[in-house]
Amino acid sequence: MCNRANANKDGVNNMMYLSKGLAVQKSTEEFRVSHCGKVFALGPEMARLWTNAQQAPKEVPAGKENYIRRLEQSGLAGTTKERGDLAHYRLLSGCIICPELDSDTKPVQTGYDGRIWTWIEQAGLRLTASELIRLEEQGTKPVPALLGEQGRQELTEQIYSSKELIWDGTLESEMERSPARDALVMSLLRLLRMGRLFWCRGGNGCETGCL
């Protein structure tokens, strides 16, 4: 399904990275990114690297590893040494997906992407890529009973209907092998390129910070 990263000429594995957070101020003098209730001011090089992977996973540029590590330590990027489809999944699986409701692009209403967008926009909790894959694997549709505040508990029970999936990391590991994985990841990447999404890392308090 994918190939491991090949070592470059210096023997260092290339990494892929994906930016997290939402740009809230862009100017020649200052670039600010909001993430989980905090605002970070980025210098020119950090801003360029963050913007580079804002709408799609990118390879870490040679010589920029320390910059990317600083972004990752601040929660503004995720990295992986995997390649291809698995790299995309690994980068997305640990993120909470947040809808960009102020986007200038047209709403996504039909087809596969429309269904995924409905979950992201209308579910009573912020979903992860792994949870969306689980819903697709089950063939679960975004019906009114599973949406909004009133559907939060039922939706959670639907996703975690198997008690084994409750343990940390179990769902991510299981969905990595799901036949529904690649289609869902590609849908998320399309929505990301359209400016409909931004990413937030997991963790206590993070969900509220993204709303």
Where do the model's predicted regions map?
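Long, charge-rich, low-complexity alpha-helical segments
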Residues: 38-211
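Short, amphipathic alpha-helical interface elements at domain boundaries
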Residues: 10-55
